[in-house]
Amino acid sequence: MTFSNRVSVAIIGGGIGGLSLAIGLLQNKNLDVAIYETAPKFAEIGAGVALGPNAQHALALISPAAEHAFRIHATTSLSPEFEHVWFDFRNGNAGEKDGEVLSKVENETGQQTVHRAKFLDELVKLIPREIAHFGKRLIHIQKDPVSGGAQYKLFFEDGTTASADCVIGADGIHSSVRKHLLGESHPAATPVFTGTVVYRGLIPMDVARDAIGEFADNSYMWCGDGGMVMTYPIDHGETLNVVGTRNDKGRWDGPPYTRPVDEETVRNDFMGWGEIPSKVIQLLKQPTMWAILDHYPAPYYYSGNVAIMGDAAHATTPFQGAGAGQAIEDALVLSTLFQRVTHSGLVRPALAAYNNVRLRRTQKVVATSRDALRLFCFNDRYVDGDAQRWREVWNGRMDWLWGMDLEKQNRDAVNLFADIVEKQSSARETMPKFGPVPFPVATSTV
């Protein structure tokens, strides 16, 4: 079999994960990178996105310029004593425990958030215009049997086609590439409603301060029976971002999965809560309601020369602030491996190594994020809002996520890639098929 010395990579989706991957791949001059985005331009939905210390480090390893893109728009808590505080968790129920401190969870970087659109705009500046193709909704992937040609043909809704040696789906929770990879009928091919909705809204900081004082300046989470109210500053302290959550919703009639909601509905869902969360909810104007979805765990993230990453691979609920960070970690591992892809015959070993290194960790994020919400909503059946047990559970709970040795993860991936290539070379007479490795699904131990 003849392999091409130039390798074409099609990235489906131009969100934070897809652009981070493109920035990394472009450092290998042997790769021809193209991004196919459904929208008419690069765009992100939602206000703030948080990146933990692991995600910020991953950005820096991909490209210092990518990390700078986050840094110039990042907002932290405003009080110096909150420099390393992720969230100050408080009891949000009314009554004698109203406002009780449950714990302050700290990490290296504290709570750092950025407006999604502004962050994306900065990443776009690092991408050559000619590699971006808009209005390209993928409808089908077909393997091209022609020897010596590109291995896959992509069919788009507008009637156009494209070809690539490698296809990487960064096309989000409703991923077309995931459906191609797993099969339309696979139970993990499409997202599921988690029974949770969030209400999102923004409050001008001066209005918020008038109502709740210094609580507006920093990151707080008010936890209570069946829900929580999360607040933190964005836009360099000009705005208070508010996320109110209820995890007691049995069904969602959708799509759409995001819709306007009247203010009275939100207030009713938090009626009888404690002083501060009640005041915050009263201030919300024109809130939106979001259905929270995730995926059943995929048994693998690649097949042949097709792979998925980010939300397309492991969409998670947002309750550990880790979804975007895991997409960036995916991009780091993939771009590290593809620095070693010098011909098209090395694509599959690179994707196999990526799959084996990333599957367990990312699926643990999905499982523990669901567990985190149960803790926040006082219905985990162990802590249930008890302050002492809360501190026991949260002591070191996030260390595995934030403290990941990313350089070691890269080395593990590269070493596995080398092992696969060596085995491939030692069996030239019959090209082995590097099939997906079905790791067991990680479960939480909270």
Curated annotation (Swiss-Prot):
Biotechnological exploitation: Terreic acid is a metabolite with antibiotic properties. Terreic acid also acts as a selective inhibitor of human BTK kinase in mast cells and other immune cells.
Catalyzed reactions: 6-methylsalicylate + AH2 + O2 + H(+) = 3-methylcatechol + A + CO2 + H2O
Region forming the signal peptide: none
Xref: SUPFAM superfamilies: FAD-linked reductases, C-terminal domain (SSF54373), FAD/NAD(P)-binding domain (SSF51905)
Keywords for the protein's UniProt record, in alphabetical order: FAD, Flavoprotein, Glycoprotein, Membrane, Monooxygenase, Oxidoreductase, Transmembrane, Transmembrane helix
Subcellular location: Membrane
Keyword flag Transmembrane: yes
Glycosylation sites: 107
Binding site for FAD: 37, 50, 116, 311, 324
Catalytic residue positions: 200
Principal EC category: oxidoreductase
EC number of the protein: 1.14.99.-
Protein family membership: Belongs to the paxM FAD-dependent monooxygenase family.
Name this protein carries in UniProt: 6-methylsalicylate 1-monooxygenase atA
Source organism of the structure: Aspergillus terreus (strain NIH 2624 / FGSC A1156)
